[in-house]
Design a protein with these regions (language model features):
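Alpha-helical membrane insertion/targeting regions
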Residues: 1-183
Length: 183
C-alpha cells in the first residue's frame, strides 16, 4: 500500500516537472523565434516600430513568463500560490485578445498603403491568419481550461495546448528569416 502511494506520488511529480519543462520550452521557442526580428534589432538600435509593437511583445511574453511561473509553482507543490495568481492569467489572456487583434489590423493597414511593394499586403494578410488562428485556438482552449479548473489533469493539458497555439508566429519567423532564399 505504501509502495503504491510512493509510486503515485513519483508519477505526479514527473507530470508536474513535465509541464514546467514544456512551459520553458515554449518560452525558449518564442524568444528564439523573435530573436532575429525583434530582440537583436532592438539590442543593435536598429528596430523601428510603434509602441503597439512593444506592447504586443510585452503582453505575449508576459503570458509565456506567467505560464512558466504557474507551472513552476505547481511543480514545487505551491498549489495555493498557483491558484491565487491564476486570476492574473485571465487578465493577461484578455489583454492578448485586444493586442493581437490591434497588431494584426495595424500590420494589414500598413502593408496596404500606397507605395508598398507589390504582394506585401497579400503576404501580410496570409500571415495574419497564423496569428488570428493561433489566438482563436488559444481563446477556446483557455476558456475550456477555466471551466475545467477543478479537474487538474484536463486544466493543465488545455493550458499547455493554448500556449503551444501561440508558437506559430515565432516558429514561422525561423522560416521567414533564417531559411528564406536570399533576395
Amino acid at each position: 500500500m505504501a509502495e503504491a502511494a510512493l509510486q503515485t506520488g513519483a508519477r505526479a511529480n514527473v507530470s508536474r516537472q513535465f509541464y514546467f519543462a514544456m512551459a520553458l520550452t515554449c518560452l525558449v521557442i518564442a524568444v528564439l523565434g523573435f530573436m532575429p526580428t525583434y530582440f537583436m534589432p532592438m539590442a543593435q538600435g536598429k528596430f523601428r516600430g510603434p509602441p503597439l509593437v512593444h506592447i504586443h511583445g510585452l503582453v505575449l511574453f508576459a503570458w509565456m513568463a506567467f505560464f512558466c511561473t504557474q507551472t513552476w509553482l505547481v511543480a514545487r507543490g505551491k498549489t495555493l500560490a498557483h491558484r491565487t495568481w491564476g486570476v492574473l492569467g485571465v487578465s493577461i489572456a484578455t489583454a492578448m485578445v485586444f493586442v493581437v487583434t490591434a497588431i494584426v489590423s495595424w500590420r494589414i493597414s500598413q502593408a496596404s498603403l500606397p507605395g508598398q511593394p507589390e504582394g506585401l499586403a497579400h503576404g501580410v494578410r496570409a500571415f495574419a491568419w497564423v496569428s488570428i488562428g493561433g489566438l482563436a485556438f488559444f481563446i477556446g482552449a483557455f476558456a475550456l481550461a477555466i471551466v475545467e479548473v477543478r479537474r487538474p489533469e484536463t486544466h493543465k493539458r488545455l493550458l499547455l495546448l493554448a500556449t503551444i497555439s501561440l508558437l506559430g508566429a515565432p516558429i514561422a519567423r525561423w522560416f521567414l528569416t533564417l531559411l528564406a532564399p536570399s533576395a
